[in-house]
Amino acid sequence: MIPVVALVGRPNVGKSTLFNRLTRTRDALVADFPGLTRDRKYGRAKLEEQEFILIDTGGIDGTEQGVETKMAEQSLAAIEEADVVLFMVDGRAGLTSADEAIAKHLRSREKPTFLVVNKIDGIDADAASAEFWQLGMNKVYQIAASHGRGVTSLLELALAPFMEELVEESLKDENGEITDLTEFEDFEDEEKDLTEEDAEKDFARLQDQPIKLAIIGRPNVGKSTLTNRILGEERVVVYDMPGTTRDSIYIPMEREGQEYVLIDTAGVRRRGRINETVEKFSVIKTLKAVEDANVVLLVIDARENISDQDLSLLGFALNAGRSLVIAVNKWDGLDNDVKEKVKSELDRRLGFVDFARIHFISALHGTGVGHLYESVQEAYVSATKRVGTSVLTRIMKMAQDDHQPPLVRGRRVKLKYAHAGGYNPPLIVIHGNQVKELPSSYKRFLMNYYRKSLEIMGTPIRIQFQNSENPFEDRGGKLTMSQERQRKRLLGAVKNRNKK
C-alpha cells in the first residue's frame, strides 16, 4: 500500500511550505481542469520511484485545555492512520507550550515520528535546535523547507522502510544526535521521460487482473448502502480480508464472468452488523483506496448541494489518474422540479469532468445500480485500451492540420510523433521541437482531440511532452570537411565573377 506521511505542528512552522514543495505539479497534463478546486490539505508526492500521500493536519494549538480537546477530529485521525509523522517546529521562534503539548500526544502513540526543526537557514542551527531536546524525541532533524535544503534527505530517512533500497549509511544516525540534513545536497528530479517499453510493461501488468473498484464519498451519502446492495445482488459471502485497522477491506466478487475487487472504505462487514446511522469517514482510508483502484465510483447525495469535499475527493481521483463513474444517490422520491435543479447544478459544477458517466440511483431500493457496472467496464476498457504509435501519430498530425500549434519566440512549434507511455490512465507521449513551451490551451485541445478520436470515455488522459534533441546542437556551428570544400569553391567562384 502507498505510505501516508502526516505533517504535524502548530501554525506557522512551515507545514504549508513543505507541503507545497513536495506536492508540486508536473509537466504532464494531469489535472488541468478549469473549475477544479485544489485541496490544500492532502496531495500526492513522489521520491524517486516511491509515491506517497501527504497530509497537512492543519495548525494545532494545545495551549489552553490540552491537545486532545484542541486538535480537530480529522487531525487526530490523520495522526492515528498515518505511517510516518513529521513533527515540525520553528527553529527561529523556539520551543513553545503548544510544541510541548503536541509532543506529549505523539509520544503516547507508537508511531514513527521525526522531529523536524525548520527555518534554520542563516542562523546557528545547532544552538536553535538545542532546546527541542526537551520534547523527548531522541532525534532532531534540521531542514530549510523554503529553500528545499535537507528535504530530500529527510524523506529518504522517513520512507526508508517503504523503499526498495536502503538509505545510504552516511545518512543514518544513532539516538541522541542532531542530524543537519541541509548539509546534504538536495535536488529536484525532472519527470521521467516515458518510453514505449514503459507502456508495454504497464499494459502487461494490467492483463488478467480483476477490476479494482473503490466506492468513495463524503459521510452519509450512502456508500455503505450501495456496497451492501452490490454485494447482496451478487450473493457473495462477505468476509474480512487480512489487514490492519487503518486499511480498507478488499472484497472479491464476480458479475457476468468479470472479476472485481471491491475496495470498501466505509467499514462495511456482514450485513447483520450494519447498524450505525453515521459512517466513520476517513480521508486517509479513502485516498489509499483511490491510489490502489482502477476505477473510482464517486457517490454524491442528490438531496444536498455539491460540496467542496465532493470536489476535493473528485480532484484527488483525477490527479491519481483513475477512471471515474459518478453515482447521484437518493434520487427516488424527488420532485421533477428538484431533479431538474440537481441536474443543472451538476452541469455547472462538474462540467470539467464531462468524460465521466453520471448515474442517478437509489442504493436503498436498487434503482439504477445494475447500470453502474456497464460504465465501470467502459471506463476500465478505455483506460487500458492498447493503441499503437502509428495511430497516435496519425491522430496528432490530424489535430495539427485542424489547428496549427502557436508560435513560440517567433518559431512554430513542431509536433513530430506520438507513442503510448502508459495505461490506467492512458498516457500519450508527444515528441517535437519546443513542445514543452506549448500553452495550456493547446495542450487541452490535443487532449480533447485524442479523447474524441479514440472514443475514450470514463477516464482522464495524460499527455507528456518531450523535446526532441537537435543532432547539430553540440557542433558549435562548425562545417564538415565536405561543407568547407564547397564553401571555398563558392567563394572562389564569387571572386572570379567579381574580377570579370
Swiss-Prot record:
Q: Where is the EngA-type G domain?
A: 3-166, 211-384
Q: Which residues bind GTP 2?
A: 217-224, 264-268, 329-332
Return the annotated region ranges for Disordered.
468-500
Q: Tell me where on the tree of life, at the top rank, the source sits.
A: Bacteria
This protein is called: GTPase Der
InterPro entries of this UniProt entry? G_ENGA, GTP-bd, GTPase_Der, KH_dom-like, KH_dom-like_a/b, P-loop_NTPase, Small_GTP-bd
- Could you tell me which species this protein originates from? Aliivibrio fischeri (strain ATCC 700601 / ES114)
Q: Which residues form the KH-like domain?
A: 385-469
Keyword Repeat assigned: yes
Q: Which UniProt keywords apply?
A: GTP-binding, Nucleotide-binding, Repeat, Ribosome biogenesis
Q: Mark out the compositionally biased spans (Basic residues).
A: 486-500
Tell me the GO BP annotations in alphabetical order.
ribosome biogenesis
Subunit relationships: Associates with the 50S ribosomal subunit.
What Gene Ontology terms describe what this protein does at the molecular function level?
Answer: GTP binding; ribosome binding
Q: Where does GTP 1 bind?
A: 9-16, 56-60, 118-121
Belongs to which family? Belongs to the TRAFAC class TrmE-Era-EngA-EngB-Septin-like GTPase superfamily. EngA (Der) GTPase family.
Q: Give a short account of what the protein does.
A: GTPase that plays an essential role in the late steps of ribosome biogenesis.
